[in-house]
Amino acid sequence: AMTDVLSAEDIKKAVGAFSAAESFNYKKFFEMVGLKKKSPEDVKKVFHILDKDRSGFIEEEELKFVLKGFTPDGRDLSDKETKALLAAGDKDGDGKIGADEFATMVAES
């Protein structure tokens, strides 16, 4: 579970901070949720939790539910937010985010 890696309180605060539509900012979110200061192993654990279909990638349809991955009451991202998040993370242009790309996004935040 996400709470094995991150504090439930931090998750609640971070998800709550972006409850308004079109407000999602992944850099601020990863920082607030405490992911930025976690070890590479922990960042990888979070990646695997978000990779719902265990494909080794977070696809666009999984990104839409990224906040739900942190907590069940997180909102769905809008199409615009989802596409912006994908564009920010998908460095090699394959239309999805791999574990290394995810780690880079966290490091950049």
Swiss-Prot record:
Q: Which UniProt keywords apply?
A: Acetylation, Calcium, Metal-binding, Muscle protein, Repeat
Record GO cellular component, one term: cytoplasm
Record-listed Ca(2+) 1 binding positions: 51, 53, 55, 62
GO MF assignments:
calcium ion binding
Describe the location of the EF-hand domain by residue ranges: 38-73, 77-109
PTM sites of type N-acetylalanine: 1
**Disulfide bridge positions per record:** none
- Please name the InterPro entries in this protein's record: EF-hand-dom_pair (IPR011992), EF_Hand_1_Ca_BS (IPR018247), EF_hand_dom (IPR002048), Parvalbumin (IPR008080)
Functionally, this protein is described as follows: In muscle, parvalbumin is thought to be involved in relaxation after contraction. It binds two calcium ions.
Task: Kindly give any further remark recorded in the entry.
Answer: This parvalbumin has an isoelectric point of 5.2.
The name this protein carries in UniProt is Parvalbumin, muscle
Originating organism: Gallus gallus (Chicken)
